């Protein structure tokens, strides 16, 4: 049972409260039994599960509750709160300082995904505008430097290592000195792992740590070992000053929940989680948003962060056009590019309320990305006049020969081109209506600039454009309106970013 299954089972248990006519002790106990069973199946320690059950029971006294209170919501809130506590170590995680040289040393057992995770962390900060680099001080595993070199080259991250020097302390020291002299902000050092916790591994870790004096030591933990993570994390903490933990392989193992709760029990803050093989299958770990996404409640704050990463604030020309209700094929092409930059579709969908982390399978995700690339390939075969025309699809309807030319140039059928134009027309019509809403593109809090009736019209337009299944997952019109309200408040008028979001 992977994490998505755990989320689905707990959500199903909580949903049973809505189906019950009367909320009594029997209904509460049945729901808690389902939640606890799901946690035990995910290899969460039985003591932690019992504690969660007792805490919820003590927080909810059905007999003492006033009749006007919403018992369902209070029970759901109590369960949510306890699930957050389950994965929260209660310790603030270390964060790098911008403009400073932050040395991060990675430790862990062999096979935990340490080298790949080094590259993922460097890439994560690089995308956020930090100057990052990688150092391979793993001289024990054959091919470690080749792997790091390959990952770094693919992501265009500077790296340092040696095929001849066998002393990891020398390599780490030289690499850190080199990158400090070049004013790198994030300096990541990968160290040797072993198949088990050998004394020689700990001794080597201490030597490297003493030589480079890292600002943060990150322990990389394999989620597949479940609650055994606790003993392993404690063993490393006793030997070196482990400040943070990254849990890997959470995408495909039944014991992910057990691993997360076990690490939290050691009071070690989890800073990131690995959710796949690709370099962007990597997410910051924040307890409340994590549980919120797990239960299909979304993470609007995380979504806004993703949008802001795109640096869409510079796109003043597009905003000016939107004010006047104009949207060209080139604009749509650029929005598709923004979506591609935001990372895996499943990661983005998990941030939208109503979608669980399992809504889009890996196969569906690849299919969606392939479709998006196909649409962009079609637009690559269009000329400037077609891409920049404010008449949009009318240019093609007036001269059907253009459709045949674009189809030939992009290697698709004329029907594919027509489908693209139909999709574009829907977007353009919505933008035209948005342009008529005064205050929508004004600075400040959008909820104050736009009237409720205007926002209702905009929501209706969005609902018409959406796949009915998607709208259903969001909780219908009420769910869409709730999400838009959250987005307004969180984005504080950042409508520029929302354009990248609306086109998903």
From Swiss-Prot:
It is an enzyme of class 3 (hydrolase). GTP binds at residues 108-115, 190-194, 248-251. GO terms for cellular component: cytoplasm; endoplasmic reticulum; nuclear speck; signal recognition particle, endoplasmic reticulum targeting. Transmembrane segments: none annotated. It is found in: Nucleus speckle; Cytoplasm; Endoplasmic reticulum. One of its GO terms (biological process) is exocrine pancreas development. SUPFAM superfamilies: P-loop containing nucleoside triphosphate hydrolases, Signal peptide-binding domain. Pfam families: SRP54, SRP54_N, SRP_SPB. NCBIfam families: SRP54_euk. This is Signal recognition particle subunit SRP54. The lineage of its organism: Eukaryota, Metazoa, Chordata, Craniata, Vertebrata. The gene is Srp54.
């Amino acid at each position: 049972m992977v994490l998505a299954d755990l989320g689905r089972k707990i959500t199903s248990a909580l949903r049973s409260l809505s189906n019950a006519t009367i909320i009594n002790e029997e209904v509460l106990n049945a729901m808690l039994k389902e939640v606890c069973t799901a946690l035990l199946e995910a290899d969460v320690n039985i003591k932690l599960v019992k504690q969660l059950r007792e805490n919820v029971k003590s927080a909810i006294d059905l007999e003492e509750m006033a009749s006007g209170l919403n018992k369902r919501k209070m029970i759901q809130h109590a369960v949510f709160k306890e699930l957050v506590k389950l994965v929260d170590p209660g310790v603030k995680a270390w964060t790098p300082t911008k403009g400073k040289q932050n040395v991060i040393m990675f430790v862990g057992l062999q096979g935990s995904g340490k080298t790949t995770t080094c590259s993922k962390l460097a890439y994560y900060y690089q995308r956020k505008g930090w100057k990052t680099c990688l150092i391979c001080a793993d001289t024990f595993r054959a091919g470690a430097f080749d792997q790091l070199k390959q990952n770094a080259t693919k992501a265009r991250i500077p790296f340092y290592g040696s095929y001849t020097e066998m002393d990891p302390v020398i390599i780490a020291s030289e690499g850190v000195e080199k990158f400090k002299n070049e004013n790198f902000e994030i300096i990541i050092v990968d160290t040797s792992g072993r198949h088990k916790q050998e004394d020689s591994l700990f001794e080597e870790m201490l030597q490297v740590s003493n030589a480079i004096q890292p600002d943060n030591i990150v322990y990389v933990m394999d989620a597949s070992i479940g609650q055994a993570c606790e003993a392993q994390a404690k063993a490393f903490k006793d030997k070196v000053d482990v400040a943070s933990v990254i849990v890997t392989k959470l995408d495909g193992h039944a014991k992910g929940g057990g691993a997360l709760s076990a690490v939290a029990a050691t009071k070690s803050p989890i800073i990131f989680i690995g959710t796949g093989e690709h370099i962007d299958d990597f997410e910051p770990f924040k307890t409340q948003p994590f549980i919120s996404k797990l239960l299909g409640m979304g993470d609007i704050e995380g979504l806004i962060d993703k949008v802001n990463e795109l640096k869409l604030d510079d796109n003043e020309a597009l905003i000016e056009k939107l004010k006047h209700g104009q949207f060209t094929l080139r604009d749509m092409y650029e929005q598709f590019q923004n979506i591609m930059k935001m990372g895996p579709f499943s990661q983005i969908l998990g941030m939208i309320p109503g979608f669980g982390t399992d809504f889009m399978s890996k196969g569906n995700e690849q299919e969606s990305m392939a479709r998006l690339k196909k649409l962009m390939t079609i637009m690559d075969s269009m000329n400037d006049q077609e891409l920049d025309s404010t008449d949009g699809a009318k240019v093609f309807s007036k001269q059907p020969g253009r459709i045949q030319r674009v189809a030939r140039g992009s290697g698709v059928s004329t029907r594919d081109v027509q489908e693209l134009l139909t999709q574009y027309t829907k977007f353009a019509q919505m933008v035209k209506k948005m342009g008529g809403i005064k205050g929508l593109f004004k600075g400040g809090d959008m909820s104050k600039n736009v009237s409720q009736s205007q926002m209702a019209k905009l929501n209706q337009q969005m609902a018409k454009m959406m796949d009915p299944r998607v709208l259903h997952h969001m909780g219908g019109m009420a769910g869409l309106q709730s999400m838009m309200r959250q987005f307004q408040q969180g984005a504080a008028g950042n409508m520029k970013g929302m354009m990248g979001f609306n086109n998903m």
